[in-house]
Regions:
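Acidic/polar-rich alpha-helix caps and helix-coil junctions
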Residues: 1-282
Length: 282
């Protein structure tokens, strides 16, 4: 654990560990890309409210945001989104709701370019997003910019030969990260037709995961499961990965069924795949 040096958020510059505070942050949360810190509240993350109060989010079993502290309202996976909240937000604060923003427009355009076969332009607009976020840009054999380093001096990530399938995966991954907690992912994976992916591809779902939106969901050990000895050190036991849920997702769940009475009224209406009945087929 990072117990001797101050941990600074690369995006905001805030220090999340203060010597003598009694709170520390695991190395797995250290030196991640800026969008991670913008979007995720993790164990022992520090909040600064109106420059007068400091709050640490503790999601382990006996923490202020764990099962003991919040019996009916705690993050079962051990992390929670923070993107919609400003650092100074309090329970009585007011924030504006974002309907659409430039990042989504760029990604929508990149996806359209990819499907039309204009791969160089697609990567260009993905790179605009990554540059704004402070992470290394991509380069490919047929991309617009062939320089080894981007405008910020970061070494570009070499994708090699740009194929439509590869660029499509790059865009999908970028949408998942850039638009996290913005109510896009749920619809994206269904629109892409991947929500029932049998085996993770390492882009949309982790390579070890099976079942797409279904299957085994894992998270941190919020409930302090384990041996009696392990349970004694609640903070450390929290970081053990455990299965939190088993979800079921089948292909038909990508669409809601058309009400059967509507289908019965008009024989030209085709019921969504997986929701057909014997009545439809007669």
């Amino acid at each position: 654990m990072l117990s001797t040096t101050a941990y600074k958020d690369k995006f905001s510059g805030y220090t999340y560990f203060t010597p003598g505070s009694g709170y520390s942050v695991m190395k797995q949360f250290y030196n991640r890309e800026p969008r991670f810190y913008l979007g995720i509240t993790f164990q022992n993350r520090r909040w600064d409210f109106d420059n007068s109060r400091t709050y640490y989010t503790v999601m382990s079993f006996n923490g202020n945001s764990g099962p003991t502290g919040n019996t009916h309202d705690y993050p079962i996976f051990g992390t929670i989104g923070r993107k919609p909240l400003s650092e100074g937000t309090t329970p009585s604060g007011v924030d504006n709701a974002v309907i659409i923003r430039l990042g989504e427009v760029y990604l929508n355009y990149a996806e359209a370019c990819c499907e039309l076969g204009d791969l160089a332009t697609a990567i260009h607009y993905v790179n605009l997003i990554r540059s704004r976020a402070g992470v290394a840009e991509y380069v490919g054999l047929n991309s617009e910019d062939q320089t080894a380093r981007d405008a910020r001096g970061e070494t570009r990530i070499d994708l090699g030969n740009l194929t439509q399938d590869l660029v499509r995966k790059v865009i999908y991954r970028e949408r998942i990260i850039e638009l996290a907690f913005e109510n896009k992912y749920y619809f994206d994976v269904r629109r892409w037709g991947v929500a029932d992916m049998a085996q993770g591809d390492g882009w949309i779902y982790p390579s070890w995961h099976k079942g797409g939106e279904g299957g085994q969901m894992v998270g941190f050990n919020v409930s302090n499961l384990g041996t009696t000895e392990e349970q004694k050190n609640v903070q450390m036991n929290f970081y053990k990965r455990v299965q939190t849920q088993t979800r079921v997702f089948t292909k038909r769940m990508s669409f809601l069924p058309i009400p059967q009475e509507e289908v019965n009224r008009d024989l030209e209406i085709v019921q969504n795949t997986g929701w057909e009945t014997d009545t439809d087929e007669e």
